[in-house]
Regions:
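Membrane-embedded beta-barrel scaffold of Gram-negative outer-membrane proteins
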Residues: 371-385, 493, 501, 534-592, ...
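C-terminal beta-signal and adjacent terminal beta-strands/loops
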Residues: 570, 665-674, 697-755
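Gram-negative outer-membrane beta-barrel transporters
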Residues: 463, 564-567, 586-674, 752
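Flexible loop and strand-edge segments within Gram-negative outer membrane beta-barrel domains
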Residues: 280-301, 307-372, 378-396
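Short acidic/polar hinge/loop motifs at secondary-structure boundaries
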Residues: 65-68, 187-214, 302
Length: 755
């Protein structure tokens, strides 16, 4: 704990010193006013930002603000406030002080950006259906990291992978998160060794937005997207506030500190340094099974990037370093005493990850709408894990390169082409001992994949009416084979407020069975790879309709409905039904099991501003996911058959107080066949449906916010999440059968400081 506090103080002082050396920028001062019964009054806490950069501030209690002037002239300054139309002012070089009067004018201005940031919305501009979770939406929850950022979303499900490691996993369209391509600002991010624990490597306070798209994505981004894509946008040094600090503490005494600072070197060059520290050193056992409900944890996460913006050229260069340790198991487990015996059961998880990245864009002079983009990243990841007598060590070395040329034949005909290269070098070792210390099983699986690829994409567009994107790519995988990935996306604006989208395409991925399925190590099951695993391959088809209505006072309502189907040509099947003593991995169709594996997902969502500053959202989803196993065609385990979602948000005048509430209704899911186990609880082959409630209250001040909240308000918990907890080295032990909450009611609080 003392190390975390010392580190946090050091980081805060360092970033403040860096900020103090920034060059003095040119400042615009102003006041925002409104008419009230023919009298002018100040408008406190209005949003003020530059249109070109979205760099902004807010007014104080007297309606005053100061903002740094961008280098470009003239510049457009936008002022927005809930209940008023935006005002846009053209700032020239001679303007130092301005006065802005907001009115309730119902006529649309030239700039039609809505006042007040929505928590989430469906982008009407993108051909691929994309749900955007904004900064405002992220602030409605504690959002300690990426895994906790989807509680308000009906698209993504989040749950624990096991009852001892604290790791969370996601699902989309009823399939595991590994089939969704996870990106950081359009660079492949969490893959390979990061699959099981990587969601915690993305602190919530670092994120500017999350973009969730269903179905296959553009061929420009690669071939791995099967069910969708999750792209995370971090805060930028060009637009972020100079200094930010967020401190969080929970009723379980988990502490988190996020701090960052931006530094503008000159009008073209800027940098940002981010630091994150999380610490949990207290042991808890709410269900009295003798095991820690959450492991002890400490994580240090550093991120630095430099951004250069010149005439026709921009570049980003940076690095990310993560060091995380988790220690758990039985309450009285001591690693120094019990590490190699069968007296007490313990777990240890150590991760070190380092990544370098760069993004570059060039405008081609003399050619309209023509540019070249180059992205590159290098990643090193070391992982050492043990669960009782099962141990795993893995190393990943990866390189990524993507080069894109984009131009147009005319305003209606755009094209892109380029090449990519993905290199992955895995060294994985897995060993499981029996209780008498004899070998149960052992695997040494080195794997090197060198994948050069080429792609081309054509876009036909009738502005405000129709967009068609057809893409194809070919990749040669040195470990597997050459494969071709076709994809098609269509967007039709039926009316100005109704949009129909459709998509179809293929996706491929290579499975890393150990690093992607760490949860099964928390059991007595033996890993059995009974087939020569092939490349996973699937088709995905989808259609969705969205409709928007606009009302007075800037209120609106939206309705979306979509259906997506995924058909696997080949899948690495994870079979935990064939035997309770091992987990089998094999290709779809192995041993004449058939060749069917599919997912159907139907979802509808309605969101409305019921009245001024009060928003209500309701959503419902149905999943139908089945796989051909050795025992026949069965529903995929741990996939909820349905889900309901209710969200409510209310803000007082000037958004001084904000109240957010979420209710999830999670449907039943099939449990694996455990009839032979005397330790198995009786659920009639299905888990029960349950409700999960969250709430948060935020008080906003000039430069800081205070928030308090609660998760799992109803205190609903899965009974006996660890089978055979009293005999962890017996064949009856299994901590991987998780279908519901394993933690009880939790309270938290925190402060966000922005300077």
């Amino acid at each position: 704990m003392n190390k975390i506090i010392k580190y946090s103080i050091f980081m805060a002082l360092l970033l403040l010193m860096l900020q103090s050396h920034a060059q003095a920028p040119e400042i615009i001062k102003g006041t925002v006013l409104q008419y009230n019964n023919s009298k002018l009054e100040a408008v406190p806490y209005a949003n003020v930002f530059w249109l070109e950069t979205q760099k902004g501030t807010s007014t104080d209690e007297k309606g005053n603000f100061t903002i740094e002037k961008p280098g470009k002239n003239p510049s457009h300054l936008v002022v927005s406030f809930v209940g008023y139309k935006n005002d846009t002012i053209i700032i020239t070089t001679d303007k130092k002080e301005i006065r802005i009067i907001l009115t309730n004018n119902t006529e649309l201005s030239e700039v039609t950006i809505t006042g007040g940031m929505e928590g989430s919305y469906i982008s009407r501009l993108k051909p691929i259906k994309t749900e955007v979770i904004t900064q405002a939406g992220l602030n409605k929850l504690a959002c300690c990291n990426l895994s906790e950022s989807f509680e308000n979303s009906a698209t993504v499900d989040v749950g624990y992978s096991d009852a001892v490691s604290g790791a969370k996993q996601i699902q989309m369209l009823g399939l595991a998160g590994i089939y969704s391509q996870l990106m950081w600002e359009n660079i492949p991010f969490l893959r390979g060794l990061s699959s099981s624990y990587g969601l915690s490597y993305v602190p919530g306070s670092w994120m500017e937005s999350i973009q969730i798209s269903k179905g296959t994505s553009s061929v420009i981004n690669g071939y791995e997207s099967v069910t969708g894509q999750i792209n995370v946008e971090y805060k930028k040094p060009q637009t972020a506030k100079p200094f930010f600090l967020n401190y969080y503490i929970s009723s379980e005494l988990k502490n988190e500190l996020n701090v960052f600072s931006t530094h503008k070197i000159n009008k073209n060059l800027s940098t940002m340094l981010m630091g994150h520290g999380s610490f949990m050193g207290t042991k808890w056992d709410e269900n009295n099974d003798g095991f820690m409900d959450q492991p002890k944890l400490n994580q240090i996460n550093l991120f630095n990037r430099w951004a250069y913006e010149g005439n026709g050229y921009h570049s980003i260069l940076g690095f990310n370093f993560v060091n995380e340790n988790r220690d758990g198991g039985q309450m009285d487990y001591d690693e120094n005493i019990h590490r190699n015996d069968t007296v007490k059961y313990g777990i240890g998880i150590k991760n070190q990850r380092f990544q370098l990245f760069t993004k570059n864009g060039f405008e081609v002079k003399g050619m309209d709408e023509t540019s070249i983009g180059i992205q590159a990243a290098a990643t090193y990841h070391k992982q050492d894990v043990y669960f009782g007598l099962a141990t795993y060590s893995g190393t990943q070395k990866s390189l990524y390169l993507n080069a894109i040329f984009q131009s147009e034949l005319s305003h209606q005909h755009l094209y892109s082409f380029g090449f990519s290269y993905q290199y992955d070098n895995y060294e994985e070792n897995y060993t499981k001992l029996k209780s008498n210390k004899s070998y149960d099983t052992s695997y040494n699986r080195p794997r090197v994949e060198s994948v050069p690829g080429v792609f081309a994409q054509y876009t036909f567009e009738i502005p405000e009416k129709l967009t068609v994107i057809a893409g194809i790519r070919a990749d040669f995988n040195s470990y597997y084979r050459t494969f071709v990935t076709p994809r098609l996306h269509v967007k039709w604006n039926i009316t100005k407020s109704a949009t129909l989208r459709a998509s179809a395409g293929k996706g491929y991925r290579s499975a890393s069975v150990f690093s992607e399925n760490m949860g099964y190590m928390a059991s007595s099951r033996t890993v059995m790879i009974v087939d020569e695993l092939d490349l996973e391959e699937a088709w995905n088809y989808g259609i969705n309709l969205s409709k928007c209505w606009e009302f007075k006072e800037n209120r609106k309502a939206t309705f979306t409905i979509d259906f997506y189907r995924t058909d696997f040509i080949n899948q690495v099947v994870i079979d935990i039904d064939h035997s309770m003593h091992h987990v089998d991995f094999y290709n779809l169709g192995f041993n004449n099991t058939g060749g069917k594996s599919y997912s159907n997902s139907l979802q509808a969502e309605f969101n409305i501003d019921a009245f001024k500053r009060f928003n209500v959202g309701v959503a419902a989803r149905i999943n139908d996911v089945k796989v051909d196993y050795l025992k026949g065609t069965m529903e995929k385990p741990y996939v909820s058959k349905y889900k309901g979602l209710l969200t409510m948000s209310y803000a007082t005048k000037y958004e001084k107080w904000m109240f957010d509430f979420t209710l999830q209704l999670n449907g039943k899911s099939r449990l694996p066949n455990m009839i032979m186990s005397p330790a198995a609880p009786v659920y009639d082959n299905y888990s029960p449906a349950y409700a999960f409630l969250l709430g948060q209250v935020t008080r906003k001040f000039r430069n800081f916010d205070i928030y308090i909240g609660s998760e799992n308000i109803s205190d609903y918990m899965q009974h006996d999440p660890i089978m055979g907890a009293s005999k962890p080295f017996s064949n009856a032990f299994d901590a991987s059968m998780i279908w519901g909450p394993i933690m009880g009611r939790l309270f938290y609080g925190g402060i966000r400081l922005t300077i």
